[in-house]
Each structure stands twice: as structure tokens, then as C-alpha cells.
């Protein structure tokens, strides 16, 4: 079986006065094994992070670095719920990928 691309998605909410600070940190952040990174603004203060990784092993290897990164930006985020805390993360193997180019 060949290595499959892997992705993680994290929903979060930024404090209004911390948006610029958050993106300053993100501009300097680079995780080894991550091939692409997207952040979508989904509401007034709501965001969704999508990371594309070479494979699940690359993602797992960066877990300590991702936790350290979250510790760095946690103060910029609002709690989503008491159960979730400040992030709502999911991850998994990419099972479908379609590229659309200038149709």
C-alpha cells in the first residue's frame, strides 16, 4: 500500500483584538511534512484551519510541535465549549481529491 495524503481540520474562534497577532504567529509557523495550509474565515470571529500532510506518519511526528504551537496561540482564542476548549480538531486520510483548473 502506498502512502496516502493526510489532512487535519481545526475549527476555532479568535478574540477580536487578537486576529492580527494570530496571523503574525501563523506566518512564521512551518510544520515539517505539511505540504499545504489553508485558513478560511467562516464567521465574524470563526475560522477553519486545513492542513495537508505527506502522510499520517508526518502528521503524527509533528504532534508535539502542534501542541507547542497551540500553547503559543491559545490566548488569542475564545473557548468554543467547556468540553472542546478552544479548538475542535479532526483528522484523517484523504479518500477523494479532485482538482479543478480554470473551467
Question: Residue spans of the language-model regions?
Answer:
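Low-complexity, intrinsically disordered short peptide segments enriched in small/polar/basic residues
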Residues: 6, 16, 22-23, 47, ...
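Short amphipathic alpha-helices within nucleic acid-binding modules
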Residues: 20, 55-67
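Short amphipathic alpha-helical segments
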Residues: 11-38, 67-71
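Sensory beta-strand/linker motifs that couple input domains to effectors
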Residues: 52
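Glycine-rich beta-strand-turn "strand-cap" elements at beta-sheet edges
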Residues: 1-7, 11-13, 35-48, 72-103
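A short, structured loop/turn motif at beta-sheet edges
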Residues: 15-17, 45, 57
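Helix-centric, low-specificity signal for extended rod-like, repetitive segments
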Residues: 4, 30-31, 56
Amino acid at each position: 500500500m502506498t502512502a496516502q495524503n493526510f489532512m487535519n481540520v481545526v475549527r476555532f474562534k479568535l478574540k477580536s483584538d487578537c486576529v492580527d497577532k494570530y496571523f503574525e504567529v501563523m506566518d512564521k509557523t512551518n510544520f515539517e511534512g505539511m505540504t499545504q495550509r489553508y485558513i478560511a474565515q467562516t464567521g465574524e470571529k470563526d475560522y477553519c484551519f486545513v492542513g495537508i500532510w505527506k502522510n499520517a506518519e508526518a502528521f503524527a511526528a509533528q504532534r508535539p510541535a502542534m501542541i507547542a504551537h497551540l500553547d503559543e496561540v491559545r490566548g488569542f482564542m475564545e473557548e468554543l465549549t467547556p468540553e472542546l476548549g478552544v479548538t475542535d480538531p479532526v483528522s484523517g486520510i484523504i479518500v477523494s481529491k479532485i482538482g479543478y483548473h480554470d473551467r
